Amino acid sequence: MAKQLSFSNESRDALEKGVNFVANAVKVTIGPKAKNVVIERKFGSPDVVRDGSTVAKEIEIENPISNLGAKLIEQVASKTKESAGDGTTTATILTQKMVQEGLKNIASGASPMELKKGMEVGLAFVLEKLSSKSISLSGSDIQKVATVSAGGDQEIGSIISKAMDIVTSDGVITVEESQSLDTELDITEGMSFDRGYSSPYFVTDQERQVCELENPKILITDQKISTLANLVPILEEIQKSGSPFLILAEDIEGEALTTLVLNKNSGVLNVASVRAPLFGERRKAALEDIAILTGAKLISEDKSMTLDQVSINDLGKAKKITITKDKTTIVAFEDTKDLVKARVEKLKREVEMTESEYDQDKINERIAKLAGGVALIKVGAATETEMKYKKLRIEDSLNATKAAIEEGVVSGGGQTLIEISDELLNLSQKSSDDLRTGINIVKEALLEPTKQIAKNAGFNGDVVVAEIKRLNKGFNANSGKYENLKESGILDPTKVIRLALQDSVSIAAMLLTTEVAIADIPEPEAAAPGGPGGDPMGGMGGMGGMGMPGMGGMGMPGMGGMGMPGMGGMGMPGMGGMGMPGMM
């Protein structure tokens, strides 16, 4: 495809247009008086959101070079969302201001590389000051942080606080849709571990990039799976039952993984696979814990068990399993509660008998995972649109609260950034030329979140910032008053602010030091098929054999079915089989 090139100030100006296009749409979503953004969906009702990352991802700009700028600032929002779970709008606002100020100075003759250095020096100073101002989160502050992150919604703050209190920081909190109008909290058995799906093709929710399995059957083994030949009988039973299926194994690779993906994508089997957590003996112990939680039998060669011996009775089950790219959460049924309790007691006895402090710590980690349980926040609403909106708000609030527990909190409403901005003045005055200008770019950007919070609440941002400096108090956008925000419970998680600053400086500096932008030249739309007087639909090509389920079953090589080598059967349209080597 032919490319178009843009150079120097021309490229930077086009990139800035893209940045402004996205940032102006995103920044209305910050603060307690934030506004909503309505997003059209091709199918179903439109989404109403107040989340910077979601808004940024939806925006495409016709000009290819400007669209590159839009994608860069989208990267800021998505990276902050991924790392902190919140703070995407703050990061976007900071980036926009740094880009605007930086480009003004470059147009006046400043060196982009020196500006970048100055911005990095300023960032290091800001992060040091931010850390020094951070305070640990006390139990009573959890609800305050959750409420602020939920846009001042007291109900959401209360539910998250209760959930945190019950399952503690070692437990798991998940958010799901409720069939009722009320938002409720339910505590059940479950756990999570740090392993994600083996392939992104297992994802069931493309927007959130998660795989969700409702009432799945679960195979747990400490063996490596590279072929599905031994599992064909059990896979056939699973397919007939219509149950989702999770394979948790030491590893699943090669032909086995490819075959599962193809069968998943062709609708033959709702399946996913996850590598077992940890390593060595600790891995086996973790698999035993998960087996007890789910009522499964651990298929292990140590117990003289092989995969071809697996029956439906050896499989575990769960209410729901949610898998992201790096984490798996299991919500278990209550009927394993006594088994889990007995397992925890056994592990506690092991701790008492173990002299190694390291081993004691690791066993205690297992106890915490098993005993912590899972808190289910069931989101109720009158309409599907409201349901999606509330669910997003709760997820953001939950992420912010977890971040606050990790690294503490600072005064909210942008007050801490304003204080640090004033302290940057001394550093700036000690620097020279473009380095000083780079520091000042960061200094000015630190004021922007508060200005936008004030603007969204109907106040003049410049006036509000001036009053904050004069009174040495923060601005409560809910009441329109200047207060001690820590006493008022208006707190921001330090981690969220830190990551927003780091990500915004990183992307802004990259954009300011860009000299050439390269993008595809859009191709003209193709003429309608069929030609004058012809069928506008064209003709339908012949279809290959569909290989529908039941044609030969899921048997061994030579038989129709799951798509093993040499097999015909349940292939995708136009294919005799699943597309594996040697398939008919």
Swiss-Prot record:
Subcellular location(s): the record lists:
Cytoplasm
* Reactions it catalyzes: ATP + H2O + a folded polypeptide = ADP + phosphate + an unfolded polypeptide
Chain residues that bind ATP: 29-32, 86-90, 413, 492
Report the PROSITE patterns cross-referenced here: CHAPERONINS_CPN60
What highest taxon heads this organism's lineage? Bacteria
Q: Which InterPro entries match?
A: Chaperonin_Cpn60_CS, Cpn60/GroEL, Cpn60/GroEL/TCP-1, GroEL-like_apical_dom_sf, GROEL-like_equatorial_sf, TCP-1-like_intermed_sf
**Which keywords does this chain's UniProt record carry?**
ATP-binding, Chaperone, Cytoplasm, Isomerase, Nucleotide-binding
Tell me which EC number(s) this protein carries.
Answer: 5.6.1.7
Q: Output one GO BP term.
A: protein refolding
Q: What class of enzyme is it?
A: isomerase
Q: Where is the composition biased (Gly residues)?
A: 530-542
What's a Pfam family in this record?
A: Cpn60_TCP1
- Single GO MF descriptor: unfolded protein binding
Keyword DNA-binding among UniProt keywords = no
What the entry lists under HAMAP family is as follows: CH60
Protein family per UniProt: Belongs to the chaperonin (HSP60) family.
> What is this protein's name?
Chaperonin GroEL 1
User: What is the organism field in this record?
Assistant: Prochlorococcus marinus (strain MIT 9312)
Q: Which gene encodes it?
A: groEL1
